């Protein structure tokens, strides 16, 4: 509404029903039949919105997109979510949440992105018994690989902010819910 151009990126993986993901995209004016990997698709509803199907682990694809778009700011909400799934599929979490996040940080660094906001997780609090949770609580003992990957994101972002002067803000989300939320989450 403020005239900003927005580019959405998603791998549209099958962690849960892809029809839910395509349904969300349809509401933004992006039709499934128009989506091709790494190609920008213009919304038919919003002049300032386009979508790219892209894996964050695809360093070349991320680099090309950042060079082409010259993003002023990045809001990275992408990650392989789910604590239970991380127990049986650890490589997926390392690839998406660590390597993918590194690719975003590097693209921000080399393309002079002015601000990065990213999703961390309440899972970083682990077995902390102090309530309410606080950013001042110790989060050095994750109890799942998912939590460890999100804590790693926080440490990586801190380093890039310090070393390369990229302003970063991490958001420790709790369960996101609603009619378009993940079907494996409780309401």
What is each model feature region?
Residues 179-187:
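Substrate-binding strand-loop-helix patch
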Residues 1-176:
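N-terminal Rossmann-like NAD(P)+-binding domain of SDR-like oxidoreductases, especially those catalyzing
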């Amino acid at each position: 509404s403020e005239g900003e151009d927005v580019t959405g990126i998603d791998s549209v993986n099958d962690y849960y029903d892809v029809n839910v993901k395509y349904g969300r995209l349809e509401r933004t004016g992006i039709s499934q039949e128009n989506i091709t990997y790494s190609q920008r698709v213009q919304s038919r509803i919003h002049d300032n919105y386009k979508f790219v199907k892209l894996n964050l682990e695809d360093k070349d694809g991320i680099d090309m997109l950042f060079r082409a778009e010259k993003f002023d700011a990045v809001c990275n909400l992408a990650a392989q979510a789910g604590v239970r799934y991380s127990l049986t599929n650890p490589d997926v979490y390392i690839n998406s949440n660590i390597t993918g996040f590194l690719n975003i940080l590097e693209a921000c660094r080399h393309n002079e992105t002015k601000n990065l906001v990213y999703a961390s997780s309440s899972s970083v609090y682990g077995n902390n018994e102090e309530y309410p949770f606080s950013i001042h609580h110790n989060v050095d003992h994750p109890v799942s690989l998912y939590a460890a990957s999100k804590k790693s994101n926080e440490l990586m972002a801190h380093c890039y902010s310090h070393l390369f002067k990229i302003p970063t803000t991490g958001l420790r989300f709790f369960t996101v819910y609603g009619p378009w939320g993940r079907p494996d989450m409780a309401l």
